[in-house]
């Protein structure tokens, strides 16, 4: 456990972690302070940060399980203590850590008698199991059990579709909520017109990320949501100047796509994710909100497609041009192959 004393200050606004502890593999706690704030500011920031922590942070979870010879979700399998439904619930609770997007495949292949835990999940290197002791099922007989799993990074909670079960394949409720709880409190100090506030933020996470990482991501997401208002004002004040900046040479990623596929060796385009490049967080989040996760997704869009995206700017297109040319050796503005 780490603790620091909190002292009111009249200096520049600053934040720090005053308490940090790990209660278990799936329960991290952090306490942070931001000060000095003017009266009313602490509540404004505290409410926004708490909502972002609980609703805007992304997480990785198991979204589907497939196994042969399973009649329906509420059936039982001879030699297994739990029903299929109970196994699915246990899989839903498995805490995973991954920074990559797209669907990842994993599996469980064991022979009983055996007590199956998260340690028995065979997952790709990009996916880390936070707590390998989490219970999945108990095989009481010498039987084989093989389960194919799908893993996905997402945000929030979404109930499975009851119409999406077929041939032993069952969807699992998406619970991508790394932050288990978040609170904020306010401490006032000073007198009269000099009254100031200290904002305390408490964060509990499931171990897939630390409270500090959660606070950083929530803050970044809030900033990204507010940036369009700033640019809207700039564009209104400098309309003529901005008109000139809209004239980028037209291009299409598709112009180079065929040639790039022929010459590129090794990693498939579907395995090159945009978070592996050096895009700014603003540009990255704009692409992500439009379901552009891989280089293949990006190469399927033209300049016009990108400019139709919400909050997307000419500067973002320029940055994508530069990044793709730098990292993937594609000269998008050159007409000749």
From Swiss-Prot:
The keyword Iron does not apply. GO terms for biological process: DNA-templated transcription. InterPro entries: DNA-dir_RNA_pol_insert, DNA-dir_RNA_pol_RpoA/D/Rpb3, DNA-dir_RpoA, RBP11-like, RNAP_asu_C, RNApol_insert_sf. One of its GO terms (molecular function) is DNA binding. It is found in: Plastid, Chloroplast. One of its GO terms (cellular component) is DNA-directed RNA polymerase complex. Residues 265-337 are annotated as: Alpha C-terminal domain (alpha-CTD). Its EC number is 2.7.7.6. Keywords: Chloroplast, DNA-directed RNA polymerase, Nucleotidyltransferase, Plastid, Transcription, Transferase. It holds the Pfam family RNA_pol_L. Residues 1-233 are annotated as: Alpha N-terminal domain (alpha-NTD). It is an enzyme of class 2 (transferase). It catalyses: RNA(n) + a ribonucleoside 5'-triphosphate = RNA(n+1) + diphosphate. Belongs to the RNA polymerase alpha chain family. In plastids the minimal PEP RNA polymerase catalytic core is composed of four subunits: alpha, beta, beta', and beta''. When a (nuclear-encoded) sigma factor is associated with the core the holoenzyme is formed, which can initiate transcription. DNA-dependent RNA polymerase catalyzes the transcription of DNA into RNA using the four ribonucleoside triphosphates as substrates. HAMAP family: RNApol_bact_RpoA. The N-terminal domain is essential for RNAP assembly and basal transcription, whereas the C-terminal domain is involved in interaction with transcriptional regulators and with upstream promoter elements. This is DNA-directed RNA polymerase subunit alpha. It comes from Phalaenopsis aphrodite subsp. formosana (Moth orchid). The lineage of its organism: Eukaryota, Viridiplantae, Streptophyta, Embryophyta, Tracheophyta. The gene is rpoA.
């Amino acid at each position: 456990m780490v603790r620091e004393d909190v002292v009111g200050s009249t200096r520049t606004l600053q934040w720090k972690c005053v308490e940090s502890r790990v209660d278990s593999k799936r329960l991290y706690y952090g306490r942070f302070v931001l000060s000095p704030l003017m009266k009313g500011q602490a509540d404004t920031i505290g409410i926004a940060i708490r909502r972002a922590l609980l609703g805007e942070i992304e997480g990785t979870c198991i979204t589907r399980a497939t196994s042969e010879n399973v009649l329906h979700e509420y059936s039982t399998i001879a030699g297994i203590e739990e029903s299929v439904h109970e196994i699915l619930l246990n899989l839903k609770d498995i805490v995973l850590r991954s920074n990559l997007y797209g669907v990842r495949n994993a599996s469980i292949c064991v022979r009983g008698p055996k007590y199956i835990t998260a340690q028995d999940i065979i997952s790709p290197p990009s996916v880390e199991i936070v707590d390998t002791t989490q219970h999945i099922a108990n095989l009481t007989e010498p039987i084989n059990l093989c389960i194919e799993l799908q893993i996905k990074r997402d945000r929030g909670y979404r109930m499975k579709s009851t119409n999406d079960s077929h041939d032993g394949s069952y969807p699992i409720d998406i619970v991508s909520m790394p932050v288990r709880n978040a609170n904020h409190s306010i401490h006032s100090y000073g007198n009269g017109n000099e009254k100031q506030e200290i904002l305390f933020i408490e964060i509990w996470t499931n171990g897939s990320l630390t409270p500090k990482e959660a606070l950083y991501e929530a803050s970044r997401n809030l900033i990204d949501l507010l940036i369009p208002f700033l640019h809207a004002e700039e564009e209104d004040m400098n309309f003529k100047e901005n008109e000139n900046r809209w004239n980028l040479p037209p291009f299409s990623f598709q112009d180079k796509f065929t040639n790039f596929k022929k010459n590129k060796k090794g990693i498939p385009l579907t395995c090159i994710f945009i978070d592996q490049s050096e895009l700014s967080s603003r540009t990255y989040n704009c692409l992500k909100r439009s379901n552009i996760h891989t280089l293949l997704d990006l190469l399927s869009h033209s300049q016009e497609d990108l400019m139709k995206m919400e909050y997307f700017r000419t500067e973002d297109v320029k940055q994508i041009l530069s990044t793709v040319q730098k990292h993937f050796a594609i000269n998008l503005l050159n007409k000749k192959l």
